[in-house]
């Protein structure tokens, strides 16, 4: 009985040792869905009560984007366009080759600022969702966001397709045609 007990302890020790050796750092964070391009930087941005928020939109779209940030319990003050330190900027820009779709965005996080650029409010919304995934609690009501450069655009023109084959019977050729149209 003593040999089995010792064998179990050795196996448990080796398993724990293996788990410790294969643990990875949180620097390479995952984002769902995976962005088109993501490059890690050095350092991190500290999102806190002192961080300012600048949005170059007016009205309902600006209010909806501000509401997205309420997922984090940090109250951000209003900022100005000329602010460059400790600011989160959401900017609508001209359509260009980097932002081919209305849902495309670029997200740049440096230790000084966070900048999300898009050609529409939809792109800013998806950039905000990515930012919320990157935010890690760092204590005392603040969040740490690792420095990163992200460019993202939708891979497909449609976000989803529903085929109800239980009530509306379709041929195999029809379903293949629908999938091919995506």
Regions found by a protein language model. Name each.
Residues 1, 17-20:
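A detector of low-complexity, intrinsically disordered, Ser/Thr/Gly/Pro/Ala-rich segments
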Residues 8, 22-23:
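Ala/Thr-enriched low-complexity intrinsically disordered regions
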Residues 15, 22, 175-178:
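An exposure/low-complexity boundary signal
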Residues 1-7:
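N-terminal secretory signal peptides that target proteins for export/translocation
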Residues 12-17, 24-159:
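Acidic, contiguous N-terminal accessory segments
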């Amino acid at each position: 009985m003593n040999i089995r007990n010792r064998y179990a302890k050795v196996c448990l020790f080796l398993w724990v040792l293996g788990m410790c050796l294969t643990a990875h750092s949180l620097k390479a964070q995952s984002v769902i869905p995976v962005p088109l391009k993501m490059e890690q930087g050095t350092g991190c941005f500290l999102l806190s009560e002192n961080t300012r928020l600048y949005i170059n939109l007016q009205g309902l779209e600006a209010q909806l984007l501000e509401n997205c940030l309420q997922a984090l319990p940090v109250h951000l003050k209003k900022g100005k366009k000329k602010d460059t330190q400790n600011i989160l900027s959401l900017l609508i820009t001209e359509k260009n080759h980097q932002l081919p779709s209305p849902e495309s965005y670029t997200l740049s996080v440096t230790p000084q600022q966070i900048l999300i650029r898009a050609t529409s409010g939809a792109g800013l919304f998806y950039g905000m969702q990515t930012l919320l995934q990157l935010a890690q609690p760092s204590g005392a009501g603040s969040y740490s966001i690792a420095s990163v450069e992200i460019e993202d655009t939708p891979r497909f023109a449609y976000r989803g397709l529903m085929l109800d084959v239980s009530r509306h019977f379709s041929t195999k050729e029809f379903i293949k045609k629908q999938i091919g149209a995506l």
